């Protein structure tokens, strides 16, 4: 988180400071990219949700949350294209924070299930234009589907950086508060949609 904030800092002194953070990140990124590549994660994620819905959670609602790269898969689950063997949806709603790996606006336009997004103002993975596209698409979708019981939300956390919702600096009061607000956003979202469902989903 500290390195992510450092990379977005301005000023000539911070440019020098960035070099150390880039070198630090470079030692971990190749390993992370290898372990989190789509070919390795996709075969685990979607079958997991199918199996969960067909077994332990057969009569329970499932919500899913994704942060950074995990948001890509939550978004796809909210397209409602992944089904159980008997054709049931595998999740009821999704929450994402500081998403990465998405294609804008296409991936957002495909969303059909209730979807909540917590965005960071300073995020290399979601530019200001992409954030605006996301907000506009979700707002338009809600206007069309609200009467049918499907809504979406987009919350911009001003001043925050990528990763704030899971790796907030507790020593920085504002950042810590914003991280807790994003957590509350997720919890409230799931409570809201689970409350609207019957026990035998």
Where are the model-predicted features located?
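N-terminal cap/leader regions of alpha/beta-hydrolase-fold enzymes
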Residues: 1-201
